[in-house]
Amino acid sequence: MKKLIQSSILLLVLSAGIHSAFAQKYFTKTGSVNFFSKTSLENIDATNKKATCVIDSKTGQIEIALLMKAFEFEKALMQEHFNENYVESDKFPKATFKGNITNITSVNFTKDGSYPVDITGKLTMHGVTKDMKTKGSIVVKSGKINATTEFQVLLADYHIEIPAVVEDKIQKSIKISATLWLEQLAQ
């Protein structure tokens, strides 16, 4: 009987540890990532509303992944050119970011508020991985998390070529912004 009680207590302690480990992670599979480039021809603007993201509130680890073909454009022809000629979505189907929120301890995930964050990591796109640093914001409201960031990407850094015909009419960098509404992972 004593061993049964000890085993039960051990099981409860282990369960509590697992529970708290899961309670540290926030997740979404409907994150919004937008890119924008102002051009003399016309603005290039697309949004992907299917980005997945996990943030570990204890360690600051963050991972984001999205399928390139999920970017939606106002014009179907732009979407076709983007996937076939620029990012070659069949060859390089996804983009990922893996990194850390370096000042995660300044974010109180149990208290409503807006917290500025510093993010470092590696962005992989078009088969190329580059180190990256950016700033962002985490807003905590009623137990939900809204993480946002905005940064510039040089197309040449990721070997994304601009055809000579339109080279002078398209910017060499694009603005990328992300809005991620995350919820605590269920236990």
Region spans (language model):
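Low-complexity, acidic/polar, glycine-enriched regions of mature
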Residues: 22-187
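Bacterial Sec-dependent N-terminal signal peptides
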Residues: 1-26
